Amino acid sequence: DLLESRGLGDVYKRQKITAFGSTRRANNAPEDDATLNTLLKSETKSIALFGKSWTLHALEVLRTSLEENVSLIEDSVAYIVSHGREVVYDAEHFFDGYKADRGYALETLMAAERGGARILVLCDTNGGTLPSEMGRIVEDVKAHIGTELGIHAHNDSGVGVANSLIAVELGAVQVQGTFNGYGERCGNANLCSIIPNLDLKMERTSIGREKVQQLMEFSLFLSEVANVYHDHRQPFVGESAFAHKGGAHIDGVMKVAHSFEHIHPEWVGNERRFLVSDQSGGATIVSKLRRFMPDIEKGDPLVGKVLE
């Protein structure tokens, strides 16, 4: 109802509700596992299962053998698939696991693939993977895995969006992220940046250009609902994303918009703003005065008086 009241009802209608939970417990049959059976009771068509990719987590967190961890991944996926559900397998800590033991991390993916997962999502759960590593690792995974891939990036190194876009360029068909980058620690990859980059710059349709025009409104709406301060410096949808302060910048934008803007603000539902400060020049003052005096020019004496 809230979305409908804002004219954003179509955003909800296009979603696929997905139940989310872990693989079965170690040394537990899938049919006897409470988590898996609860997921099935959700009656969602799609179920996301997460499992361990890192030897450290299998041995020290699950406290099971590496062999049992591989089995529980395959068994859990196969059990859900046998009930006619689509499985999205989230390979938790995949990149850390790959860097610690490449062969084992790939083996866990193959287990999920054998179980029948539709998509294998490579998760940078700790957010420590750099873009240079991302490309190399995804390419290697593609050489060994035939199932479609997804990406789940965290922003602990400040590169969650970059890593997500690299994965898409290399063939990932699903991007897991959050609007406004909400999430654990430093947040998840920000969909408010990923979506316009895909649709406007990379010629990859995520929600379509028409829907992208609602992006800022949706971002503000979510901030209100979450009761979280809206970051005005957010790329694309922040109030300062297209705000200009320096006199030379403003003069340039007024002459040729893209001289200091990478896209048109209205493409994402934002707007251009000129800020008045001690750095302002005549162009800034003219832009403000034209709201009341449409014909005023930079050489008008009034502009000089305001600057004084």
Put a short name on every predicted segment.
Residues 1-12:
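Single conserved hydrophobic/aromatic residue that forms the stacking wall/gate
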Residues 134, 186-193:
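Histidine/acidic-residue-rich catalytic or RNA/ligand-binding cores of hydrolases
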Residues 25, 66, 95-98, 102, ...:
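Hydrophobic alpha-helical scaffolding
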Residues 153-179:
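Small-aliphatic-rich amphipathic alpha-helix that forms the alpha element of a beta-alpha
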Residues 14-21, 83-90, 145-155:
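Short beta-strand/loop segments at the ligand-binding rim of alpha/beta enzyme cores
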Residues 51-53, 170-187:
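Glycine-rich phosphate-binding active-site loops on the catalytic face of alpha/beta enzymes
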Residues 196, 202-308:
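A mid-to-C-terminal "edge-of-domain" accessory segment
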Residues 28-88, 92-147, 165-170:
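Alpha/beta enzyme core
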